[in-house]
A protein has these predicted regions:
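A conserved beta-strand/loop element that lines the FAD pocket in flavoprotein oxidoreductases
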Residues: 1-6
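FAD-site-proximal beta/loop scaffold in flavoenzymes
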Residues: 8-19, 24-100, 192-195
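Extended hydrophobic-aromatic, low-complexity segments
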Residues: 45, 139, 177-178
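Residue-level detector of short coil/turn "hinge" positions at structural boundaries
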Residues: 49-51, 110, 188
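Mid-to-C-terminal Rossmann-like scaffold of FAD/NAD(P)H-dependent oxidoreductases
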Residues: 74-174
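C-terminal alpha-helix
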Residues: 101-105, 185, 198
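A short, polar/charged loop-to-alpha-helix boundary motif
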Residues: 172-190
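Cysteine/selenocysteine-centered motifs that mediate thiol-based redox chemistry or coordinate metal-sulfur cofactors
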Residues: 188-218
């Protein structure tokens, strides 16, 4: 069912199906929304503020008009993985962009170093965290671990000697470590094997790097 979308949700007390814009009806017991985000930029339409999919900003979250800033889902911030500005519609990125915009508006120079896609949610008691790129091209290696007994699923995506994404289901304890590795574009070639076995921790890092991550190099 391509080239169409949901026009109406069917059912009274619970969902029984959907009506598509092309007139087709589909029966279902569950409806999951995952159709992406299109920023509402009507506020700056037909103005001097430059827009693309979202409002175009620089590393200080400034728009093309002096004195006007934008942040959050409506702005196109720098994506560390795509290496270009794009909409980063997640709460952590919105918080950081808002902070940077606020500091600069208050006269305190600040730079948005960049972000990437990151989502955390819980379905039916199962925590899920996803981050980074899925379906990337190039020298890609994916490490997957599935444990049916504990209902856990883990996938880490490597490109060369960098981690560019991961998916964790029902065991998200090490997601913070991976998020930091992606954010800082760390070369993990020296300890990639430890990361791939899914039982890693800071103890798996080389001594110098472990010291930097835990104590800031002190």
């Amino acid at each position: 069912h391509l080239g169409t979308t949901v026009a109406e949700i069917l059912g009274d007390d619970k969902v029984s199906g959907v009506l598509l814009q092309n007139g087709d009806e589909l029966s279902c017991d569950m409806l999951i929304f995952a159709i992406g985000i299109t920023p509402n930029i009507d506020l700056v339409k037909d103005t001097a503020v430059e827009t693309n999919k979202g409002i175009v900003v620089d590393k200080h979250m400034r728009t093309s008009v002096n004195g006007i800033y934008a942040a959050g889902d409506v702005a196109e911030g720098y994506d560390l993985l795509f290496k270009k500005n794009r909409v980063l519609a997640t709460l952590p990125n919105a918080y950081k962009q808002g902070e940077i915009a606020g500091l600069n508006m208050a006269g305190v120079p600040a730079v948005f170093a960049g972000g990437f896609a990151y989502n955390a949610i819980s379905f039916f008691g199962f925590p899920i965290i996803t981050a980074g790129l899925q379906g990337a091209e190039g020298n890609i290696r994916e490490e997957v671990e599935i444990d049916e007994e504990t209902c856990t699923y883990k996938k880490i995506i490597f490109k060369d000697d960098n981690i560019i994404g991961f998916i964790f289901l029902n065991d998200v304890d090490r997601a913070g470590i991976l998020t930091g590795i992606i954010r800082d574009s760390l070369d993990v070639g020296e300890f990639k094997g430890h990361l791939a076995d899914m039982k890693f921790g800071y103890a798996s890092f080389p001594k110098k790097l472990r010291k930097e991550r835990l104590f800031g190099g002190v």
